[in-house]
C-alpha cells in the first residue's frame, strides 16, 4: 500500500528525500555563524533558491537546443545560469538587506540559497525512479546527489560569498571586483565538476567527490578567515 501511495504521489517522497540533505547541511552551516540570522530571512533565502530553479531549467533547455553538441560551452552556460540566478534571488532577498551586517553573512545566505536550489533539483531527479517503483535507484540517486550535487552547490555559491565577505569593508568598486571574481570562480568550479563527471569513467566518480570534499575543507578554512575580518575603520 505504501509503494502504491508513493508511486501515485511521487513528489511527496521525492521532496522529503530531496530536502533532508539540505536540512543537514543547513544545520551544519548555521551553527558556524556565531550571530544567527533571522529565521524569516533564512526561510525566504531557501525558498528563493528553490524558485530560481523555475527560471534556470527553461533557460537550460533553450541552451541545450542550440549548443548540445558543444559540451564545454553548454556546461559552462548551464553553470553560469545556475550560479547567476542563485545569486540574484538571494541578493534581492537578503544580501542587500540590513540583516547582512557582517562579512560571514554573505556566505551563509548564499549557501542557504544553494540548498534551496539543490532541494528542488534533487526532488526533480528523484521523482522518476520513485514513480517507477525503483527504490534502490532512488536510494543510490539520493546518496550520490547528497555527496556530489549538494556539496558542489554549497561550494560554488560559498565561493561567491567568500569573495563578497573578503570585500565587505572595502570600497564599492572593490566590492564589485570581488563579486565578479567570485561569480567567475563559481562558474569555473561548477562547469569543471560537471565536465569531469561526464568524461571520467564511473569508477573514478568517487575520486571526483573526494576532490569536492577537499574543496569543502578549504571552504571551512576560508569561512573561518572571513569570520575573523573586522572593520579597521571603526
What annotation goes with each model-predicted range?
Residues 1-234:
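Hydrophobic alpha-helical segments at protein termini of multi-pass membrane proteins
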Amino acid at each position: 500500500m505504501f509503494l502504491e501511495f508513493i508511486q501515485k504521489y511521487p513528489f511527496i517522497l521525492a521532496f522529503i528525500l530531496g530536502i533532508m540533505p539540505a536540512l543537514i547541511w543547513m544545520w551544519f552551516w548555521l551553527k558556524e555563524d556565531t550571530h544567527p540570522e533571522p529565521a524569516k530571512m533564512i526561510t525566504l533565502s531557501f525558498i528563493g533558491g528553490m524558485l530560481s530553479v523555475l527560471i534556470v531549467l527553461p533557460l537550460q533547455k533553450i541552451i541545450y537546443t542550440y549548443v548540445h553538441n558543444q559540451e564545454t560551452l553548454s556546461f559552462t552556460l548551464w553553470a553560469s545560469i545556475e550560479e547567476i540566478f542563485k545569486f540574484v534571488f538571494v541578493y534581492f532577498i537578503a544580501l542587500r538587506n540590513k540583516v547582512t551586517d557582517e562579512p560571514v553573512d554573505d556566505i551563509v545566505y548564499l549557501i542557504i540559497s544553494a540548498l534551496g536550489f539543490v532541494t528542488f533539483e534533487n526532488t526533480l531527479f528523484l521523482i522518476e525512479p520513485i514513480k517507477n517503483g525503483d527504490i534502490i535507484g532512488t536510494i543510490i540517486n539520493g546518496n550520490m546527489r547528497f555527496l556530489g550535487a549538494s556539496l558542489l552547490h554549497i561550494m560554488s555559491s560559498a565561493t561567491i560569498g567568500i569573495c563578497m565577505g573578503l570585500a565587505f569593508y572595502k570600497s564599492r568598486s572593490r566590492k564589485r571586483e570581488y563579486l565578479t571574481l567570485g561569480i567567475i570562480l563559481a562558474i569555473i568550479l561548477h562547469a569543471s565538476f560537471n565536465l569531469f563527471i561526464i568524461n571520467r569513467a564511473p569508477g573514478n566518480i568517487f575520486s571526483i567527490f573526494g576532490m569536492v570534499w577537499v574543496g569543502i575543507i578549504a571552504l571551512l578554512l576560508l569561512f573561518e578567515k572571513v569570520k575573523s575580518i573586522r572593520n579597521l575603520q571603526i
